[in-house]
Amino acid sequence: MHQIYSSDVSSITSKSSIAKAEIITMEEEQQRQSCCTWFHSLKVQIWIAWLGVSAGVMAGTVFAIQYQNWIAVTMCFISSGFATLVLHLHLAYKKTQMAGWSETRLRCLAAVGATVSFLSFIAMVFCLVVAGIEHQTLDKQGLMGANLWIAAVWFFMTSKWSALTWRFARKYRAFCEESQPLLAAAPPEYSVTI
């Protein structure tokens, strides 16, 4: 039984129960037609993570070779690293390899993601304020060297991917807690001596 996300009434059936209430269910074979449901599917999330990895690597290469903006280059590659972590979490969940992971590993990933997200957001705000005060430009000449407008964009991207690392590490940790048995090992045998 699925929750209904679309307003398409033709795909639902109603069944009456004993208390004269109606239960609305969707058939298992029918596809949901909501954009929100499509966007949050695991396949789409994997593609978005791949896009984040490739965008970080390509942008880092361009900013290193053409503009020599080393702050942006560093943040591009850090952002790509967090996108890789998100991709790894999704693929491990999809391949059901996450069942053997310890809760501590996912807690550490979540803590690192939350910390880096917070620090990157503060750095983004700092870059925006300083770039505005110094009247940095976005023309060809202004982009050469340490341009804080571009650095702010990549601090934001790092903040986003590290926040997604935090979010999915917490989500998959809850999944691991549900899937693990209450007793990982057999209980110790009790011996009674008379």
From Swiss-Prot:
The keyword rRNA-binding does not apply. InterPro entries: HRG. Heme transporter that regulates intracellular heme availability through the endosomal or lysosomal compartment. A motif (Di-leucine motif) lies at residues 182-183. The gene is hrg-1. Signal peptide: none annotated. It comes from Caenorhabditis elegans. Pfam families: HRG. One of its GO terms (biological process) is heme transport. It is found in: Endosome membrane; Lysosome membrane. Its main location: membrane. This is Heme transporter hrg-1. Belongs to the HRG family. The chain crosses the membrane at residues 45-65, 71-91, 113-133, 143-163. Keywords: Endosome, Lysosome, Membrane, Transmembrane, Transmembrane helix, Transport. The keyword Protease does not apply. One of its GO terms (cellular component) is lysosomal membrane. Specifically expressed in the intestinal cells in larvae and adults. Induction: By heme deficiency. It is a multi-pass membrane protein. GO terms for molecular function: heme binding; heme transmembrane transporter activity.
